[in-house]
Amino acid sequence: MHAEFRTDRGRIRHHNEDNGGVFENKDKQPIVIVADGMGGHRAGDVASEMAVRLLSDAWKETTALLTAEEIETWLQKTIQEVNKEIVLYAESEMDLNGMGTTLVAAIMAQSQVVIANVGDSRGYLLQNDVMRQLTEDHSLVHELLRTGEISKEDAMNHPRKNILLRALGVEGKVEVDTFVVPFQTSDTLLLCSDGLTNMVPEAEMEEILKSKRTLSEKADVFITKANSYGGEDNITVLLVERNLMQKGRDAS
């Protein structure tokens, strides 16, 4: 597997509340994670850092999970535990009250990838030169869009587009979505925070993914493009390709 991770403060924010990275378990099986924190007085930094650290630390203690079912079970269970830890920590620290974070994570399983998400950080897959969104935003605006109360154009500039219906660290239990999709050697997986998707039109995102650039160059272009559109939020991008020689390996 080849992965490229980038995070950038953007052009407006004074600090970066996004977090993420690539982490391996005892059998070198990778997990990729992106989290976007929220809350005043840098509480968002704490929430996203905790989510990534706790989930990756738990992953580092596992051995290879070979089936999608095993991975889904592990993600559901572990993300619940991470959520409880964040809630308890926020309750113990007065200035962290109200903090929370989104989370999107992915683990490879044979010729598939398992995605888990909470909030509005997204997962996309480029397959056969077509990009599609795998995750569903857990946000007020997405719910209004889903029920037909607003148009896609309205959603882009909606004044309440930052209101989440689900996040880690808010309540004692959180609903986690998981998806299992085919992931072949010619495919590219993109995990990102809304600092990318709120700035860069999806048609341009698809063109970047389809381009002949290297994976590293694509990651850089995503950050540059989001900043060129205004960089109004922190921007985090994680790109994943499966290496050709790893196609038949369980932990590739």
Curated annotation (Swiss-Prot):
One GO cellular component, as annotated: membrane
Q: Which residues form the PPM-type phosphatase domain?
A: 2-242
Where does the record place the region Disordered? 1-22
Cite the PROSITE patterns for this sequence: PPM_2
Q: Which Pfam families match?
A: PP2C_2
Q: Which Gene3D superfamilies match?
A: PPM-type phosphatase domain
Nucleotidyltransferase is among the record's keywords: no
Write out the residues that bind Mn(2+) 1.
Answer: 36-37
Membrane topology for this entry? Peripheral membrane protein
State the family named in the UniProt similarity comment for this chain: Belongs to the PP2C family.
Record's protein name: Serine/threonine phosphatase stp
User: What is the scientific name of the source organism?
Assistant: Listeria innocua serovar 6a (strain ATCC BAA-680 / CLIP 11262)
